[in-house]
């Protein structure tokens, strides 16, 4: 009698999951937002991971874990995209300090260098929007690779401006 032994299936591995929480991730994409799409795509990875760190990449990164991936599910689902920008580099560094494991980044930007995994979300399109508002102050952000025109109305006056990338 001959027995054939299959290679054992690959076991899930520990994981550092960095999720972009910048304002651009709140952009509509299909029936939800880019962040919703990112959550949907990375949730299976997180749920299977025996140990994970989840890092919200906002202006100041915020980490959860290390913990079993399934224990971080609610934290992932509760993430919001509201920061003016996401500091992916700082978020990746924080995750690596907390857990020595492959890093997967979910973002609507290009793949960051030096990570083991990338989950890209969002259609490639020009993105112009308000990134900060205060009394007497308005900041516009341009995610395109070229200057874009904008029109802003303040106190009944209309201003046309060119917003650099």
Roles of regions detected by a PLM:
Residues 1-165:
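N-linked glycosylation sequons
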